[in-house]
Each structure stands twice: as C-alpha cells, then as structure tokens.
C-alpha cells in the first residue's frame, strides 16, 4: 500500500472534514483553545463550533497537520503546531510541574493522531509523524514535544491513543523528560533547521 501525504490547508480542508467527521467531532480543537468551551461533547453545537473554529484557524495559518491518503482518500492525520497554536498543553497539571524548556526559541507540539479504523496497524501514524517532523525542520526546527500515553489501560483502547505511543516517538529520536500524571509522559527532541 503506497500512501501519500499533504499538509492541512484551505485546499485540503475538505479532506480533513471527511476524516474528522468520522473521528467524533473534536476536530483537534481541544489543544488549540486556552480554556475549555462550555458545551458538552454530546451537544451538536459543540461539533459545529469545533468545525467552524478549525476552519478559521486553518484560514489564518494557525493550524497545522499532516494528512495521509490512500490514493485520494484521506485515512489519517497528525496534528502539530507551535506552542502558541496549541496553548492548552500549558494548562495541564503535570505539564505545569515541568514547564517548557528554558530558552527554547521555537517550541513545537505534536498533540493528536487519528487513523481510520480500516487503516490501523499499517504505518499511517508513523508516516504522519515522520512527515510532521520533516515539516517542522523545513519551518526552522526547534524543540518538539510529544505527550504519548503510557497507561496500559488507556493504551489498550484505540480511541485513547490519539497522543501516540512512547515507542513510536522513541524510534524518531525523542527522549523521555518527565511523567505527566499517571497516564502520559513528556518526550522531547531537538530538530536542527534545514
């Protein structure tokens, strides 16, 4: 199976919509907001607001993701972005104990993966991660953070692996920095610019 990749943009937003609708309605907006919105995830307005806000972020160039395709069908994505694009991480209790690295000029974050059920276990997330890291390098590099799940209970459920796994990040050269509560771990890697 030969996959291709594309960056999330106004041109690829309709492809993102196709796969985001399958994912459940978050639209990868949780970490793009500094504070939670006051709607429950079961509320139809929550999904509409997330879609609208994601589109606006993409149009402003404030939302980054790698889309993975099987021919012309979008089958997965990896969201990444600069710290200012994904501010919610800073509010996490575990993250606040560690904080961002001192003196980091450019801090990037990898927050979400989604792979269509029919394509899981076929290397889609790995391809998306590699492409995201290459994109970060082209954009000047810097320190990249990841927050994979380490809880065996949570990792056993596909829907809870949206952060990725420690193993996939370790293979890309990330090192463990600190635990994030009992369910996650902070990992970092420095990428030199092109």
Label the predicted regions.
Residues 56, 60, 74-112, 120, ...:
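Conserved acyl-donor/pantetheine-binding loop and adjacent beta-alpha core of acyl/acetyltransferases
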Residues 138-142, 150-178:
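Conserved active-site alpha-helix within GNAT-family acetyltransferase domains
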Residues 110-115, 121-138:
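Conserved acetyl-CoA-binding loop-helix of GNAT-fold acetyltransferases
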Residues 16, 63-78:
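Conserved beta-hairpin
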Residues 63, 182-187:
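Short hydrophobic/aromatic beta-strand or adjacent loop that forms the aromatic wall/cage
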Residues 1-38, 194:
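Conserved N-terminal entry element of GNAT/NAT acetyltransferase domains
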Residues 110, 144-146:
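Conserved hydrophobic beta-strand within the GNAT/NAT acetyltransferase core sheet
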Residues 30-64:
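Active-site rim helix/loop that mediates acceptor-substrate recognition in acyltransferases
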């Amino acid at each position: 199976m030969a996959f291709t990749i594309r960056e999330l943009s106004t041109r690829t937003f309709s492809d993102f919509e196709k796969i985001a609708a399958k994912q459940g309605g978050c639209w990868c907006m949780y970490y793009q907001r500094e504070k939670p919105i006051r709607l429950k995830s079961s509320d139809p307005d929550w999904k509409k607001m997330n879609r609208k806000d994601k589109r606006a972020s993409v149009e402003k160039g404030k939302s980054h993701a790698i889309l993975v395709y099987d021919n012309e069908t979008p089958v997965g994505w990896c969201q990444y972005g600069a710290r200012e694009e994904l501010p919610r991480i800073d509010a996490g209790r575990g993250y606040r104990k560690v904080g961002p690295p001192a003196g980091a000029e450019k801090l990037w974050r990898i927050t979400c993966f989604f792979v269509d059920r029919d394509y899981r276990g076929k290397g889609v997330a790995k391809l998306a991660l590699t492409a995201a890291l290459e994109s970060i390098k082209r954009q000047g590099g810097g320190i990249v953070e990841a927050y994979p799940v380490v809880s065996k209970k949570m990792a056993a459920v596909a829907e809870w692996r949206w952060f990725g796994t420690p193993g996939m990040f370790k293979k890309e050269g990330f090192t463990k920095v600190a635990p994030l509560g009992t369910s996650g771990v902070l990992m970092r890697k420095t990428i030199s610019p092109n």
